[in-house]
Amino acid sequence: MKYIIVTGGVMSGLGKGITAASIGRILKNRGYRVTAVKIDPYLNIDAGTMNPAQHGEVFVLGDGSEVDLDLGNYERFLDIELSGPHNITTGKVYRSVIEKERRGDYLGDTVQIIPHITDEIKCRIEQAATEGDENGAAEICLVEVGGTVGDIESMPFLEAVRQMRGELPEDEMVLIHVTLIPEDTMGDMKTKPTQHSVKALREAGLYADMIVGRSEHPIGLHTKRKIASFCDVAAQAVVSATTVPDIYQVPVELEKEGLADAITTHLHLDRREALEEWYNVVAREYTSRITVAIVSKYGIEDVYLSIKEALKHAGRALATEVKIVWLDAERYEPCQLADVDGILIPGGFGIRGIEGKIRAIQYAREHNIPFLGLCLGFQLAVVEFARHVLGWKDACSEEIGDGRHVIAILPEQEGVDDLGGTMRLGNYPVTVKAGTIAEQLYRRSTITERHRHRYEVNPEEISALEEAGLVFSGLNGPRMEICELPGHPFFFATQFHPEFRSRPTRPAPAFLGFVSACRKNKKTP
């Protein structure tokens, strides 16, 4: 197993996760089997209970793990399926060590950060790295150490990496440090922040083999040589990673900088020619443009990162640029929906913004605007239909109020008090009905999709909803998973989250259908 450790310095938010995913992609382009591990140095067990406004999207893996959004980037860039062990948190590590101490596994030892915590970290990295899938075990494992070098929270993880480096042969680990190269008012690139960041890395007992400099403009040879001189790396090991308009362009830029060659040389991997698949995806040109309104609770785009990317995947496959208009569910005006080509209601929880989302669904249904609802968007589509087609004015979800509960809590969720990891999570099979839009999109009778919810369509109300014209075209046993409206340009909603399985090379069918319908019903120039 070869390890690529990715650390970050100077500041957070540099795009370290995208850089790590892109490194994995350029190696996969050369035919290597690559997996990835994200280390999050927070005390939470996982991302499931974290405020998305602070932390961004909670990404759900196939095994039901609720993880950091960077794992979504890994899955999209590498086109792989990861599992919970690939997200290591301080909370998981400490809980495991404390449980072992309580069982007596340490035989009376004084339990300390070194060696017990660091041993647990190393064990978890190695277990995740060697976990295989249908394609076999990986050859290369990317390990992104979250946070910034110098943070107190990251120190045990950096120490574990230091120990691993000493235990492994030199050609089995490479450390890539991602740092910021700012410019002064005269446009000159400043290397001092990078020098200090590398110094902090050395203080942790680690040294960088390669440096990726994040900058607004390409890093010139003079600056690269200066960084190389002060940071003890070769000039060709200093790589420029400029800001690009499309994140899927980053692997192409890193390949041009020679990073793949530098990594394979350091790790003594055989040289292989890069495959063209990724470059063909990136190079596709747009022939049309649509505008999609996302009516949401949060005004932070990272909360809906996978939806943004899934729209981009579908748009690229259909040569259509997708412009997103973000509308606050509590404040938007109906006139703002008049000129969009499609309306999307994402998942979410709680009562805030619910009525605004329902009004947007009603507008889409009555004005024949393509509509896609996801998770909560699916549930609210049922509520809207019950209110305005069946005339049940008090129709609502059990989650949000009293009235006629067309959306009810799942039986297994009754009496559940703990919030973390207790929802209906991960992959479940969905049976697709013949002769429906769902069948046209998926072209299969059974599909597998990822879930994250506690509520479902009330079984007692299904017959009345179907008799009024709502079609439930996807089922999981007694549970309704997909609904659609015949005769509408595109009115489609899913209880599951199709965005979590969308890939640049394999867009999610629900998003393909939505973007295609938006193109056909295009209003915007």
UniProtKB/Swiss-Prot annotation:
Keyword S-adenosyl-L-methionine: no
UniProt keyword annotations, A-Z: ATP-binding, Glutamine amidotransferase, Ligase, Magnesium, Metal-binding, Nucleotide-binding, Pyrimidine biosynthesis
Binding site for ATP: G13, L14, G15, K16, G17, I18, D70
Source organism: Methanosphaerula palustris (strain ATCC BAA-1556 / DSM 19958 / E1-9c)
Binding site for CTP: S12, D151, I152, E153, K190, T191, K192, P193, T194, Q195, K226
Residues that bind L-glutamine: G348, L376, G377, F378, Q379, E399, R454
A GO molecular function held by the record: identical protein binding
Protein name as annotated: CTP synthase
Active site positions, chain numbering: C375, H497, E499
Protein family: Belongs to the CTP synthase family.
